[in-house]
């Protein structure tokens, strides 16, 4: 029972990304608009489990490290909303900004609690142990839904009712990244013994091309980019362990992938949909034939940013001025706080990525941090809002907590 609860707690980090797969596994079909109550119930339930479990652990066990600043981050966000509501009459709980504020409470606050707990009690084993279970559950759901995807007449058709082509591609790429990281890192710490057996090793190798193919079949462009970035980053980090074997493995994986997709028109069309932003050898992140609404939003954002380029329009009032989030983290940051906020954001992100790299170089048992941080880094370039993205907050808070420890360790070396 304890292990099941721990799995549910870790799933809180990615529940927004995988909920459509969980619904499909239990046979629930829902409309994304009409079924919003079901989604809200699921998210609130996982948030409650996560916060309740962390509080219980904190009360019953003595922490190895003392740190409180992440809780002040939560208080600052709450304070900023109510402060802006005093100056901007449209910033209310009933407004679009208010809804995003509530989503911050449901999505971000629980994982901030969890990241702080993991650091304070040295419990990264929670992530290492449960990440591959989540990967297997999601892969199973994706494989079971391949017939539905292949019979779809439009890339907009989803699975489980709510998972569209973007969700399918992103989730498949995320599963691929978790799987490849476990294989190449050769990490055995904190993992269940059954998953270290030769049988599961063969299964994991077999799943890699399947996960990559489903990512392409989904037709999501961001997911395709996540797949490529994950492959490149994981190969770069872990090829030093055994470059020859890694190179041969990579070649075989690519050959298997190319051979399979070459026999199906559906995979070919998915491939074309996934990479149709590749124009003239460059990636166009702004103009997108299939994303007219997002292109219009981004064109609108340039005007809004130009109205207040230095200090922006406010963390929450910026959402009111823009009417929506921009599906791009840098545009959202510029609208909220202008160049000043963007500078602070860059400084923080530089520290996050530098700490992540140092952790991966020195702690093989924490290898699972790599796929967890690549996912939101790619996703937030194309979709979603960073303030309500649980993966973004979890990775940012956790790596910042570890930053001082690993900076000092590198200096001693």
Where are these regions (language model features)?
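N-terminal signal-anchor transmembrane segment
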Residues: 1-59, 76-87, 144-145, 376, ...
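Aromatic-anchored transmembrane helix interface
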Residues: 39-46, 67-82, 91-117, 129-139
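A juxtamembrane structural motif centered on a specific transmembrane helix
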Residues: 1-7, 192, 199-202, 361-366, ...
